[in-house]
Amino acid sequence: MAAETFLFTSESVNEGHPDKLCDQVSDAVLDACLAQDPDSKVACETCTKTNMVMVFGEITTKATVDYEKIVRDTCRGIGFVSDDVGLDADRCKVLVNIEQQSPDIAQGVHGHFTKRPEEIGAGDQGHMFGYATDETPELMPLSHVLATKLGARLTEVRKNGTCAWLRPDGKTQVTVEYLNDAGAMVPVRVHTVLISTQHDETVTNDEIAADLKEHVIKPVIPDKYLDEKTIFHLNPSGRFVIGGPHGDAGLTGRKIIIDTYGGWGAHGGGAFSGKDPTKVDRSGAYIARQAAKSIVASGLARRCIVQVSYAIGVPEPLSVFVDSYGTGKIPDKEILKIVKENFDFRPGMMTINLDLKRGGNRFIKTAAYGHFGREDPDFTWEVVKPLKYEKASS
């Protein structure tokens, strides 16, 4: 009898999607603040609609930041250069409403900068998750990896002119058929590929489908996962000319599953973009990913999830949880002990160990195409940490 398989789907959106535009603006602001003042406290939100981008939130920094320039440069870099593609970076209205961080929060979290790193408290309460699986070289879920890479490839062929008819906005979705191998996930085949991409007026649906198959799907999805039964939905709505902020409103922090594991694992609900590393929504999720990835990379489990939780103003985590989904080579309680001994979950120490105070052109890179599974030295939380522990004598 054939083994039971199941279908699992993950989606992604391009850098030109309105919500992702907002994530990138928020992280561009964070980068600019950290580049001049590594101790900047940043909680920057962005929203957008037709012909308008607004940045708002709480920022305490010694940096001199030209918010309007950051907004326009970010929009232009994505490709929003005229109204007909969804936004004109040079002519749109830019609104700024930034205040300082509440002094109540400041004294509770970092004692107005008087605390040592190990004493710095969490910027808020919350719980975060990290996940890893041995089904791909990135130790990420295949459905998420493929959906994300299709979106990145759409942008690549738009910007290099291979598919000149493409416009910045777009969405992808991949359904993978999986086998459950005693708790580990084994991809069998790609069941369905869905791409909806913004395009100009001149291109036909047949041209869109042919170009997407040849220049986007073929280079991204390995042949071994495609067969004659694979279903393709390529711009199934038939027309997608109006896009970007003209088509939909956008807001920071509305694509948190795309940012993480594509629906696998779990999510504590906190978004990442526009937040400095004292915000454990971000730093806690990053260290939890490094812990889960290191467990899988070390061979202690084929699949692993790590949860960590915090109270505002308290440095030590309230709880740390590990589940290997039955794939552990040793009991989960022993894996948990190894995680606690090898990773420092205090916010001030996570910031140092992952070098999270460094801005520049760093966090904006995380704000499109996922925060995890990326090969880039700036993604320090993706570095597998060699685990020190007592190996049981056989």
Curated annotation (Swiss-Prot):
Primary site of residence: cytoplasm
Protein name per Swiss-Prot or TrEMBL: S-adenosylmethionine synthase 2
UniProt KW keywords: ATP-binding, Cobalt, Cytoplasm, Magnesium, Metal-binding, Nucleotide-binding, One-carbon metabolism, Potassium, Transferase
Annotated binding of K(+), by residue: E45
UniProt binding sites for Mg(2+): E11
Swiss-Prot/TrEMBL catalytic activity: L-methionine + ATP + H2O = S-adenosyl-L-methionine + phosphate + diphosphate
Subcellular locations according to the entry: Cytoplasm
Residues reported in the UniProt entry to bind ATP: H17, D169, G170, K171, S237, G238, R239, F240, D248, R254, K255, A271, K275, K279
Cofactor(s) the record lists: Mn(2+); Mg(2+); Co(2+); K(+)
GO biological process: one-carbon metabolic process; S-adenosylmethionine biosynthetic process
Function recorded in the entry: Catalyzes the formation of S-adenosylmethionine from methionine and ATP. The reaction comprises two steps that are both catalyzed by the same enzyme: formation of S-adenosylmethionine (AdoMet) and triphosphate, and subsequent hydrolysis of the triphosphate.
Record HAMAP family: S_AdoMet_synth1
InterPro entries: ADOMET_SYNTHASE_CS, S-AdoMet_synt_C, S-AdoMet_synt_central, S-AdoMet_synt_N, S-AdoMet_synthetase, S-AdoMet_synthetase_sfam
Cofactor note: Binds 2 divalent ions per subunit. The metal ions interact primarily with the substrate. Can utilize magnesium, manganese or cobalt (in vitro).
Cellular component, GO annotation: cytosol
Organism superkingdom: Eukaryota
Enzyme nomenclature, EC number: 2.5.1.6
Pfam families cross-referenced by the UniProt entry: S-AdoMet_synt_C, S-AdoMet_synt_M, S-AdoMet_synt_N
Family: Belongs to the AdoMet synthase family.
Residues reported to bind L-methionine: E58, Q101, D248, K279
Name of the gene encoding the protein in the UniProt record: SAM2
Pathway field: Amino-acid biosynthesis; S-adenosyl-L-methionine biosynthesis; S-adenosyl-L-methionine from L-methionine: step 1/1
Single GO term (MF): ATP binding
Subunit structure: Homotetramer.
